[in-house]
Regions:
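Active-site microenvironment for binding and transforming phosphate-containing groups
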Residues: 1-192
Length: 192
C-alpha cells in the first residue's frame, strides 16, 4: 500500500505488522539499542529524561520533546509537515528532539524546549547545536486567518500577499532567542 515503505507510525491506518517490520529495520540499520517514542500532541511538554518504549506499540507519554544522555537510546520524533528539531550539546553526551508544528511555534516551544534541556543537564544554550529537519517551507505554510491564529509579534514572519508564514525563519529566531548561537543552528531546507 501507499504507506508501507518506511512508515513507522501505528496511528495512520497502516498494517501493524508492516509498521513493526519497518521499525525493526530502522533499528537494525541505525544500530541503536532502544528508542523513546512520544504521543505527540502539538504542545509544549518536554520530558528531560526520555523513557524507552517498545518497537511493537505507539508511544503513550503525551509530550512534544524529550532528551537523553543514555548512549544507544534513540529519540523518535514523527513529522509530516511539522518541524523536527534535533539538539545536541557540544560534548556529544546529551541530545534532545522536539516536535514543533505551527502551534508549537506559537507556544514558543523551541525556546522553552531548549531552556528545559539546558536547565536539566546544567549547561548553557551557547553550548548547543540545533538542526531543523524537513518540514513545511516558507512558500507553503498558508494561513488564511493569520491575524486570528497568530499574536501580533509573530506577524512579522507572515507574508500577507501569499498568505504564508516563514516557520523556518521563526524557528531560527526562537532558537536564537533561547540562547543558541546563529552559527550553531542548521536547517535542512526541504519542504514536505
Amino acid at each position: 500500500g501507499p504507506k508501507e515503505f518506511g512508515n513507522i507510525s501505528f496511528d495512520v491506518g497502516d498494517n501493524p505488522d508492516t509498521v513493526r517490520k519497518n521499525r525493526e529495520e530502522i533499528q537494525q540499520r541505525l544500530g541503536f539499542n532502544a528508542w523513546a517514542e512520544l504521543k505527540q500532541v502539538h504542545g509544549e511538554v518536554f520530558i528531560p529524561e526520555a523513557v524507552p518504549t517498545s518497537l511493537d506499540a505507539p508511544g503513550v507519554i503525551k509530550a512534544d520533546g524529550h532528551a537523553t544522555d543514555v548512549p544507544g537510546l534513540a529519540l523518535l520524533i514523527k513529522t509530516a509537515d511539522c518541524q523536527p528539531i534535533l539538539l545536541a550539546h557540544e560534548s556529544g553526551k546529551h541530545v534532545a528532539a522536539l516536535h514543533v508544528g505551527w502551534r508549537g511555534n506559537r507556544l514558543e516551544f523551541p525556546i522553552s524546549g531548549v531552556q528545559a534541556f539546558c536547565q536539566h543537564y546544567g549547561f548553557s544554550p551557547q553550548e548547543v547545536f540545533a538542526v531543523r529537519g524537513p518540514s513545511l517551507g516558507p512558500a507553503r505554510a498558508e494561513f488564511v486567518n493569520a491575524a486570528a491564529e497568530w499574536p501580533a509579534p509573530f506577524l512579522k514572519w507572515y507574508n500577507p500577499e501569499t498568505r504564508t508564514m516563514d516557520l523556518w525563519g521563526l524557528t531560527k529566531a526562537q532558537l536564537q532567542q533561547a540562547g543558541l548561537l546563529a552559527e550553531r543552528i542548521f536547517g535542512i531546507n526541504t519542504c514536505t
